[in-house]
Amino acid sequence: MEEFQVYLELNRSRRHDFLYPLIFREYIYALAHEHGLNKSMIFFENQGYGNKFSSLIVKRLILRMDQQNRLISSANDSNQNPVFGHNNNLYSQMIAAGFAVIVEIPFSLRLISYSQGAEAAKSHNFQSIHSIFPFLEDKFSHLNYVLEALIPHPIHLEILVQALRYWVKDASSLHLLRFSLYEYCNLKSFITPKKSISIFNPRLFLFLYNSHTCEYESIFLFLRNQSSHLRSTSSGVFLERIFFYGKIKYLGEVFYNDFQNNLWLFKDPFIHFIRYQGKSILASKDTSLLINKWKYYFVDLWQYYFYLWSQSGRVRINQLSKYSLDFLGYLSSVRLNPSVVRSQMLENSFLIDNAVKTLDTRIPIISIIGSLSKAKFCNTLGHPISKPTWADSPDSDIIDRFVRISRNLSHYHSGSSKKKSLYRIKYILRFSCVKTLARKHKSTVRAFLKKLGSEFLEEFFTETEEEHVFSLIFPRGFFALRKVYRGRIWYLDIICINALVNHS
């Protein structure tokens, strides 16, 4: 890592957050293209620079973009530059790719330095996607409302550029970024993010979008922290927590004697914030009036501070007891588990009804069947079909693919409260595998299974690694083992979502 810092000479650039000198490094563009540059690329037209500064790199790119614009104005019908033989936006795309590498360097250094610290071992477990579900089990059962907000996307390029102003101090880098963005996107908006990623450098776009999102989150979390320190009573006069500083001070000075014995009634609100796939999720124990206020805080913050148009209909409020939250491939909701306790005092006995709130996590079976149908494993009704594109592969490869998909889904959805949906997914993949092999050998499913025997699909029924470990700890038929199989299991080695799970 020290050699990497010396190679990029970051000590001088990072001291004042000056990134502009790094733009003139040839190897920055080699890093941007993963050393996949060939001799036809303009970066290697001058190979004698080595590790020296070369202002000709960016200057040549800018000049060619300027010459290219003149050619475009004279030949708008051509999608290919007739002189240079490159696409219209190639040169600005090259600058954008190099800039994407440069702006990620400071954050990469911070991440590496943090991972080498004392907290590295502790933070490893929190990298797993499943690590958030034990937190939800502990917290969500005590909350009342959940607020889901679709994060609006910037409608103008300047909004994305301005997100970098607070930590990039040199104006030259921002001017160059702004110039390349406007030239490359031709003043197009970013209203539709998926379409924009397809026409723009994905690495730089995601960095700019995340920087913009983190900026609004920092302001929101500041408001949330301020409101959490503002202690309120149940009086309707003090429901506005954002502007509570003066009220609390006035309350403490004037009514201190009257409320001295009741100050313990003040309590902090329970607010938890999560961002996931373009959504902001806010769960709270507050009343419906306060959660509605947070809804309008979201909309006003986006519209008046970040100049983002957001309709109030894009922000939904639901009660956790009546709503299932679609989150990370699970449908999470709060369920009441009733229980009856028999109590006896002297000669009198009576029954006590007790309901305990628990987090219920279920598999969104309809969405996963839709993903399996899109991947040609089944039809829209969930009936297994053959996978014709895999029919040319060897039998062992076909079986290995299906088994790997089945085990990955089983591993990811091990935290489901109800295993019936998981068994249905396994059934679809199992018979899709059989139909694919029968199609390859030009046979029927029944004849194919009769020929090979029932042990042919034993790969789908064999124990997973986790089940094997549990079977070593608990004896066969032990009650605790059956309870573990039926219960939820969260693993700390899942760092990405399966494509079939990521249905949205």
From Swiss-Prot:
Keyword Protein biosynthesis: no
Gene Ontology biological-process entries: mRNA processing; RNA splicing; tRNA processing
UniProt similarity note: Belongs to the intron maturase 2 family. MatK subfamily.
Record protein name field: Maturase K
Keywords: Chloroplast, mRNA processing, Plastid, RNA-binding, tRNA processing
Keyword tRNA processing recorded: yes
Compartment list: Plastid, Chloroplast
Source species of the chain: Gossypium schwendimanii (Cotton)
